[in-house]
């Protein structure tokens, strides 16, 4: 296995895997989450930004994590950007827990998508689509 230490941005992982790296470790998803930076398929979202203070949408409506997706239980709706913004601004521990959960889910899903693209022989096409989406912005 080829190991790359301390690299953690989604784009860095995609490029490293594209170039043959097999293993990573990095604190970036959790550290960024604690500081209010969330990863989405359309780019990074800085939840502390005032524009999210009344935004009722989930972080990423296509994300299936427990933070973004209400799932089958309508009594447990997703956590809105406004609520996450509020938690981060008042330094409530739940804010860091929820944002960390989302970012880790994002990374696990990203790596799952890459594994599937490798198995299907479509990694190059998947990589282009990944960059196209990330450049849209949130």
Labelled PLM ranges:
Residues 1-4, 9-138:
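Alpha/beta catalytic cores of nucleotide-metabolism and tRNA/nucleoside-modifying enzymes
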